[in-house]
């Protein structure tokens, strides 16, 4: 299956290029809106995800660190599940971070000149040039900061991509055809090994998302690794009985063939003494 990620700036040409690439190749075009909808299975609403990605206000630090992990894992699980359903073109930001180690994924960055994006803001928002410029600068700053917090990367770093295109020097049609042509090259074709790696990555993301979303569990330092369907789960739990609960939950996840758990039990004060200590 083919996977193309197209990262782009706000009010750029990313959506148009992605939709055209998908049309040329006959792939499914997906965006954050589709991913957010899929994420609802893990208990994250569209409003919550938008708040994490774009709100100006800062969460209390510990709460933000915890929610950052939850949202990143849920988002990765959703996009991996969609990739398992067939050929996809994903457009948005940080798409290249969803498939680490999957060699047949083609990662694209579209660089649209600021002046062109300002014109788009003016047209869509009904703003004059200076307010539009300020709006765009603020939006870019917020989104870049949040992506760095979520993935610990500078998403504009060109070394994270296979191909960088300057849309000031090409049309949407030409850019789309260039991407489509590159995607057909041998190095971006799936192999049995890369398909297995994608399956394992999807299982890992699903396991992490399900365990994190479960209200029955209290796991810290959670680590999950999948090898050909065999899942290894480790971390710190507050009661020994939770280890079997985790194993039972993981076994029900599609694609899991075997579960091995490696937990350290460290009871919390509330578990030891209750609320009336």
Where do the PLM segments sit?
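N-terminal targeting leaders
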Residues: 101, 112, 119-123, 139-140, ...
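ATP-dependent small-molecule kinase phosphotransfer cores
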Residues: 35-90, 127
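Short glycine-rich anion-binding loops that position phosphate/pyrophosphate groups of nucleotides
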Residues: 66, 94-96, 170
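ATP-dependent NMP and nucleoside kinases share a basic, alpha-helical "lid"
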Residues: 87-124
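Post-Walker A helix-loop "phosphate-sensing" segment adjacent to the P-loop in P-loop NTPases
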Residues: 24-30
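Extreme N-terminal starter segment of soluble prokaryotic enzymes
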Residues: 1-3
């Amino acid at each position: 299956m083919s996977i193309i990620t197209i990262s782009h700036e706000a009010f750029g040409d990313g959506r148009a290029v992605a939709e055209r690439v998908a049309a040329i190749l006959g792939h499914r075009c997906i965006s954050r809106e589709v991913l957010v909808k899929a994420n609802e299975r893990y208990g994250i609403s569209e409003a919550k995800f938008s708040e994490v990605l774009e709100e100006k206000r800062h969460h209390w630090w510990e709460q933000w660190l915890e929610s950052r992990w939850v949202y990143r894992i849920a988002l990765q699980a959703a996009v991996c599940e969609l990739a398992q359903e067939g050929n996809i073109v994903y457009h948005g930001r940080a798409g290249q971070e969803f498939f680490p180690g999957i060699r047949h994924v083609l990662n694209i960055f579209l660089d649209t000149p600021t002046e062109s994006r300002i014109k788009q803001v003016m047209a869509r928002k009904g703003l004059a040039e200076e307010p539009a410029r300020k709006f765009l600068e603020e939006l870019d700053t917020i989104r870049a900061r949040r992506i760095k917090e979520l993935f610990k990367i500078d998403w504009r770093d060109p070394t994270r991509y296979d191909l960088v295109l300057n849309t000031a020097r090409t049309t949407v049609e030409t850019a789309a055809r260039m991407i489509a042509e590159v995607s057909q090259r041998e190095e971006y074709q799936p192999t049995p090994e890369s398909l297995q790696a994608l399956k394992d990555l999807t299982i890992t993301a699903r396991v992490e998302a399900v365990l994190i979303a479960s209200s029955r569990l209290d796991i810290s330092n959670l680590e999950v690794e999948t090898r050909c369907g065999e899942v290894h789960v480790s971390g710190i739990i507050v009661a020994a009985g939770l280890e079997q609960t985790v194993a039972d939950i993981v076994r029900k996840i599609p694609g899991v063939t075997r579960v091995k758990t490696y937990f350290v039990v460290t009871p919390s004060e509330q578990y030891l003494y209750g609320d009336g200590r």
